[in-house]
């Protein structure tokens, strides 16, 4: 398969089951909603070392938020429910409770309920007050700028993590330009995040390592500087490879985001140095969700 001169490899991405939640952060204005949400979703690129994977899903108009203020929705993913609940509580307490004018609400109603303000309320030292509105409980916690309003719980659902594709280009600037175009398109798709910095990964990994203590190591087959030292997947003209990783609330959401991103990257075409699209294929060792590139782009 070739799209605008870009070869689409006959391969697939592998992804794995996760647990996820969505929360809504509001504030006096969008700038401060972003400050809180960006802090809450920081250091959350990979569950390998960060405890969770998280990112901002989209901005919300006042008409879309529970308190009628500007806001953003954020998605958080972890391998299990206990881990997700702990990460959410820690991040909410350290990054949203602390942020001026912020409030925090559930973004998913269904599924197992995990604490949001249920435990954060104790920061109020007995001065906290609960309110029940429309069958939902909220906590008003006194803080120095006024009150922090936080919904008691949010819903946790089954989700999918680790969808991905690789962009292979003639140069680093060209690979990055294609990634930026892809991310811009993918951010229009609901229910997904691309958790790495700017949505892009340069240090793609393979399972295992020559060092016994490492569960993953550099994907040497796709490293352009190692063409003469390893079983390379790269042809001579490829000098840069970058990866986009996607977490989604369903496999269908990830497939939509992958299609949008690949279409955008291929829009630049071979004339702009984009030569191939591939994916992280680990022979079925990583996860049960398989995203075949050519099926997605058919």
Curated annotation (Swiss-Prot):
Catalyzed reaction equations: N-formylmethanofuran + 5,6,7,8-tetrahydromethanopterin + H(+) = N(5)-formyl-5,6,7,8-tetrahydromethanopterin + methanofuran
What GO molecular function terms would the record report? formylmethanofuran-tetrahydromethanopterin N-formyltransferase activity
Location of this chain's protein in the cell: Cytoplasm
Q: Which GO terms describe its biological process?
A: formaldehyde catabolic process; one-carbon metabolic process
Give the EC number(s) under which this enzyme is classified: 2.3.1.101
- Keyword terms of this UniProt record: Acyltransferase, Cytoplasm, One-carbon metabolism, Transferase
Where primarily located? cytoplasm
Please state the pathway this protein functions in, per its UniProt record.
Answer: One-carbon metabolism; formaldehyde degradation; formate from formaldehyde (H(4)MPT route): step 4/5
Q: Which GO terms describe its cellular component?
A: cytoplasm
Into which family does the record put it? Belongs to the FTR family.
Subunit structure, briefly? Homotetramer.
Check the record and name the NCBIfam families matching this protein.
one_C_fhcD, PRK02114.1
Q: What does this protein do?
A: Catalyzes the transfer of a formyl group from 5-formyl tetrahydromethanopterin (5-formyl-H(4)MPT) to methanofuran (MFR) to produce formylmethanofuran (formyl-MFR) and tetrahydromethanopterin (H(4)MPT).
Q: What is this protein called?
A: Formylmethanofuran--tetrahydromethanopterin formyltransferase
């Amino acid at each position: 398969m070739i799209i605008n001169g870009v070869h689409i490899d006959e391969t697939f991405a592998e992804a794995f089951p996760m647990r996820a939640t969505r929360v809504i952060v509001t504030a006096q204005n969008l700038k401060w909603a972003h400050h809180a949400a960006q802090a809450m979703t920081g250091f959350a690129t990979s569950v390998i070392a960060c405890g969770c994977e998280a990112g901002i899903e989209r901005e919300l108009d006042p008409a879309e938020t529970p308190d009628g203020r500007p806001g953003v929705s954020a998605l958080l993913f972890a391998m299990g429910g206990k881990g997700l609940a702990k990460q959410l509580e820690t991040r909410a307490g350290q990054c949203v409770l602390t942020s001026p004018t912020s409030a925090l609400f559930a973004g998913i109603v269904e599924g197992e309920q995990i604490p949001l303000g249920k435990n954060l309320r104790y920061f109020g030292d007995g001065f906290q007050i609960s309110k029940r509105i429309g069958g939902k409980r909220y906590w008003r916690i006194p803080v120095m700028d006024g009150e922090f309003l936080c919904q008691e719980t949010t819903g946790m659902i089954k989700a999918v993590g680790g969808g991905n594709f690789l962009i292979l280009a003639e140069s680093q600037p060209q690979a990055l330009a294609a990634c930026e175009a892809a991310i811009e398109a993918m951010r229009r798709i609901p229910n997904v995040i691309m958790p790495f910095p700017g949505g892009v990964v340069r240090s793609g990994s393979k399972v295992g390592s020559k060092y016994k203590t490492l569960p993953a190591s550099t994907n040497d087959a796709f490293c352009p500087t190692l063409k003469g030292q390893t079983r390379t997947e790269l042809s001579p003209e490829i000098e840069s490879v970058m990866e986009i990783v996607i977490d989604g609330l369903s496999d269908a959401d990830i497939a939509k985001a992958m299609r949008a991103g690949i279409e955008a990257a291929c829009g630049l075409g071979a004339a702009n140095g984009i030569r191939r699209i591939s994916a992280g294929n680990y022979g079925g060792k990583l996860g049960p969700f398989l995203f075949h590139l050519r099926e997605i782009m058919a």
